[in-house]
Regions:
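C-terminal motif of bacterial Sec signal peptides marking the signal peptidase cleavage site
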Residues: 20-23
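Bacterial N-terminal signal peptides that target proteins for export
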Residues: 2-12
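N-terminal hydrophobic targeting signals that begin at the initiator methionine
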Residues: 1-2, 25
Length: 355
């Protein structure tokens, strides 16, 4: 998983993952006014031992040049300093220019500050944030709701909505601020008329695109959060064989909660994260030598609790019609002949997959 601010940056510029083109690539001249482009930071550290990354880019100004083109910033010195004075240097990725990486785990109760020296001589810092205590994600449940509507042909149709709900512990001494992310992965079987050889694919997808699910737990009584709805989606052909939800619960600072709440307000007004924001949402990044140098993004310090949840026809107690069929008069789709062409598709079965 990419850093937290990638959840906003990627909303602007990509969906499931970065597509990196290889082979022969013609030079592209980016029509971006350097005087108007701003530095955008995508940074995140958690209490999990993993490769953390900090992504640097120039964010184009909406309405100027080619909107949403974000050229990476290479050659910067990037690192994180903790409250004890230890400095953790990040190295630029050889595969992704402008992305700086390091294997590390943050420590709960310790504070962390991002320090960046850009190639043009500017310094960028974040305000120090203390790593919050991890609040354990205890349980996951689902609910199925039938919804009836009149379709475009004037006929009555019924859809099934699958709702995910979670239970979590709550720190009694210091109430957490939560954000949830939900990803998905499903099993896909090729099938078509007179098929001779077919494959099974395992397809990953981003589910909460353009959605934010937040909670200020100071509003909750007791030491547990119960039946909190965090996500819903239609129960469709993706559940025909098996679906796996990847659920991450982030315990974050109040400052970060306010940041994402401001982003959420933009979405709730009917806008999209692809739309020009009505006003710049201010993060925790700054240039100490120039208060007018606006730095976009937020350096996140958050603890993470993770769980997987499987759903299939047996668990759901419901038959789900597969997308692909060997019956000639049924609709036929290209991926039913070659599912490896689907974005996010892999042929290798995950080792955690249920039999």
């Amino acid at each position: 998983m990419r850093p937290l601010f990638s959840h906003i940056k990627k909303f602007f510029c990509l969906s499931l993952s970065l597509l990196i083109c290889s082979a022969c690539i013609d030079e592209i001249r980016l029509d971006i006014d350097a005087d108007q482009a701003k530095v955008a930071i995508d940074g995140f550290i958690s209490d999990s031992l993993r490769v953390h990354s900090i992504a640097l880019s120039y964010s184009s100004v909406f309405g100027v040049g080619n909107d949403n083109i974000q050229p990476p910033i290479s050659g910067a010195n990037v690192g994180i300093r903790d409250g004890a004075g230890n400095f953790f240097s990040f190295e630029e990725s050889s595969e992704e220019p402008g992305v700086y990486e390091r294997l590390m785990a943050g420590e709960v109760g310790q504070s962390y500050q991002l320090e960046i020296n850009l190639p043009d001589g500017r310094e960028i810092r974040s305000r120090a944030i203390e790593m919050p205590r991890n609040n354990e994600l205890m349980g996951i449940e689902y609910e199925q709701i039938e919804r009836t509507f009149i379709n475009t042909a004037g006929n009555v149709s019924t859809t099934i909505e699958l709702i995910l709900k979670i239970d979590s512990e709550l720190d009694a001494q210091k109430r957490p601020f939560f954000r949830w992310r939900v990803g998905g992965q499903y099993e896909f079987h090729e099938n078509y008329p007179m098929a001779l050889s077919t494959k099974w694919c395992y397809i990953s997808e981003t589910l909460d695109f353009n959605q934010l699910e937040l909670l200020d737990a100071r509003e909750i009584e007791g030491n547990e959060l119960r039946n909190k709805r965090i996500f819903s989606m239609p129960l469709d052909s993706r559940f025909a064989w098996q679906y796996c939800f990847h659920i991450r619960q982030f315990s974050m600072s109040e400052e970060e909660y306010i940041y994402w709440s401001n982003i959420q307000e933009i979405l709730n007004t009917g806008g999209s994260l692809f739309d020009p924001p009505p006003g710049t949402v201010k993060g925790n990044l700054f240039n100490p030598a120039d208060e007018n140098d606006q730095i976009l993004g937020f350096f996140s310090v958050a603890s993470v609790s993770y769980k997987r949840y499987f759903a299939n026809p047996d668990i759901l107690n419901r038959f789900v019609d597969p997308k692909c069929s060997a019956i000639p008069f049924r609709p036929q789709f290209p991926e039913c002949r070659d599912c490896s062409t689907v974005l996010g598709s892999e042929l290798e079965k995950p080792d955690y997959w249920l039999p």
